[in-house]
Amino acid sequence: MEYTHQYSWIIPFIPFPVPMLIGVGLLLFPTATKYLRRMWAFPSILLLTIVMMFSLDLSIHQINNSSFYQYVWSWTINNDLSLEFGYLIDSLTSIMSILITTVGILVLIYSDNYMSHDQGYLRFFAYLTLFNISMLGLVTSSNLIQIYVFWELVGMCSYLLIGFWFTRPIAANACQKAFVTNRVGDFGLLLGILGLYWITGSLEFRDLFQIINNLIYKNEVNIFFLTLVALLLFCGSVAKSAQFPLHVWLPDAMEGPTPISALIHAATMVAAGIFLVARLLPLFIVLPAIMNGIAFIGIITVVLGATLAIAQQDIKKNLAYSTMSQLGYMMLALGMGSYRAALFHLITHAYSKALLFLGSGSIIHSMEALVGYSPAKSQNMVLMGGLTKHVPITKTSFLVGTLSLCGIPPFACFWSKDEILNDSWLYSPIFAIIACCTAGLTAFYMFRIYLLVFEGYLNVHFLNFNGKKNSSFYSISLWGKKEVKQKLKNKNFFLALLRMKNNEMTSFFIRKIYPHRINQNVKNITCLFFDINYFGTKKTACLYPNESDNTMRFSILVLVLFTLFVGTIGISFSYKGIDFDILSKWLIPFIDLLHKNSKNFVDWYEFLTNAAFSVILTFLGIFIASFFYKPVYSDLQNLNLLNLFEKNVLNKKVADYFQNVIYDWSYNRGYIDVFYDISLITSVRKLVQFNYFFDKKIIDAIPNGIGITSFFMGEAIKYVGGGRISSYILLYIFYIVIFILIWYFLFTNI
């Protein structure tokens, strides 16, 4: 074990040759490097697999021995200053390294096919590998300075990948938005690190927590200042993990390629914030105000993320808000002191969300053949539907991920989420009720995605892409602005799912008309025809979405296995005296404020009681989603239920107003972006414009005015001093007159 730990420092550096060689190759041999570009996927995957095997060995040792290993090198600059750097191996490090490498390998395999057509293939793999390196360096860091360095590298890689298609203005703006938002949190983190060093004189984790505890015990530290420092440290996690109010960058980050969205949301960018809070939890625990603040921010984010997800059209933005909500659960658990539950949910959510994102990437990949490469169309759920028979493997995989995220037993997220919900009843019944209700809301918006994408007809068949009016319901240009027009024709039920608001927004509730018969013209549409010219010969092609290639399906199917079985590592049960709770062994020693006096802290009766309540709410959310989104023609009973609801609703106007308020809140992102735009962005721009005006018109005007005045005075004087004695005498008399006048006005009144 000692031998294994001695070489743990190489973990972040093993994959480093790939981005380095790609960069050198593109610089020195660009043609050959681009020609052989597909070969770079193999070393990327191979080296990360080696890291995974190394991490797996460390994890096995950690489970068996529950050890803590730290090695530090010291570089002494002078007697008063020395720099220390090293690596730290404990349970948190081993868990995160396994998570990063397993998800990273599957994303790399998936990306080889997904990005094969892209001219930036090599650049993408270099960024992606560097992203994994940065995250591995972050989780193995032994002090806060190292963490901050790798923290910034993780951020840099995420910005590069969010703005990967930088020629698209939307992607470039999303990259800038992520950068600016995270600057706020990172600046707070830097101030917190400096404040902590000022208090303790050390940033090494082996000394830091002990020094803080001693200072508090001896009452030698200002608690208010220490709380402020801890709050600044937490600000970094708020921004990185997209917690309220610094969450606004996360949905816009979906402008990057889908594989990087999977990696960001599963194991790197947003996981970094959770990791930092978990690493600093011994510091936060001694400050109850900070712990309560973490839990409060977590519960707000849980609710906000769920409510903002219920009316989004973009499939990736829906999943982004879902990630935001699930990260809120993890932050809530850490704020409650439930360390095990938070890390358990981090693990299960990572694999489930990676599965959902790679599944959505497969859907987007198949839709691009029909609607083009514009994300406004290929990611728009309004244009999907009926994909079950076209992409059955993706559909089944996506359903598994959806059931897991909803918390349906026995899938992975059920065990972790319900452990958080169970602990929340011990912490605060109010928080527990909110968290349980949000679990039902999670089921609603996740099945909304599933039903809109896979059920019904392929909605793109009703669109005309040439911009000319015809019998289709909508006219939409392939790349330009949306030209969406609602046309009620023959009272087709299909419009219930495609109700457009303000020419671009789709309601999340079925509206108005529920016919008993389906128009035969709708039934008879079987494929979408395009006229294609091949060297003057006109041919007609029939396009359907197709299942992804084998490499993409391989990653998805492996993640299905993880989603099915990874939850078992955290189930507390024993057989013949043997404890099979792998996660608890892995995390020993760990912090648990809610079960201090219990060896086996899972009360199965209490757990199952609370789980039954949350599962009932989950099924209620699924039922409501099916009620509104399941195609009415697929089930006559569902159609009758809709008509019954339409006839017997007490006050239709009130109901419509209520759902419109919910829809507007969700679609407009809770008006938080608008608030920031008005209160911050517009104000800052006006301030900058005023500063520019003041600088150019006032500050610069003073020296410029003096210069211009001097120039004209010189021009006037040069004509006087032309070598003529009469001019000199006249100028001399003029000066004398001025001197006499000055003397007269100054001294005559004395």
From Swiss-Prot:
GO BP of this protein: ATP synthesis coupled electron transport; electron transport coupled proton transport
Record EC number: 7.1.1.-
GO molecular-function terms, A-Z: NADH dehydrogenase (ubiquinone) activity; quinone binding
Family: Belongs to the complex I subunit 5 family.
Annotated protein name in UniProt: NAD(P)H-quinone oxidoreductase subunit 5, chloroplastic
NADP is among the record's keywords: yes
Keyword annotations from UniProtKB, A to Z: Chloroplast, Membrane, NAD, NADP, Plastid, Plastoquinone, Quinone, Thylakoid, Translocase, Transmembrane, Transmembrane helix, Transport
One Pfam family in the UniProt entry: Proton_antipo_C
Described function: NDH shuttles electrons from NAD(P)H:plastoquinone, via FMN and iron-sulfur (Fe-S) centers, to quinones in the photosynthetic chain and possibly in a chloroplast respiratory chain. The immediate electron acceptor for the enzyme in this species is believed to be plastoquinone. Couples the redox reaction to proton translocation, and thus conserves the redox energy in a proton gradient.
Catalytic activity: a plastoquinone + NADH + (n+1) H(+)(in) = a plastoquinol + NAD(+) + n H(+)(out); a plastoquinone + NADPH + (n+1) H(+)(in) = a plastoquinol + NADP(+) + n H(+)(out)
GO cellular component terms attached to this protein's record: chloroplast thylakoid membrane
Subunit structure: NDH is composed of at least 16 different subunits, 5 of which are encoded in the nucleus.
Keyword Zinc-finger in record: no
Organism: Glycine max (Soybean)
Encoding gene, per UniProt annotation: ndhF
Membrane protein topology class: Multi-pass membrane protein
Gene3D superfamilies: 1.20.5.2700
Entry's localization field: Plastid, Chloroplast thylakoid membrane
Membrane spanning stretches: 9-29, 40-60, 89-109, 125-145, 147-167, 185-205, 219-239, 258-278, 280-300, 327-347, 354-374, 396-416, 425-445, 554-574, 607-627, 728-748
UniProt enzyme class: translocase
Superkingdom, natural source: Eukaryota
Main location: plastid
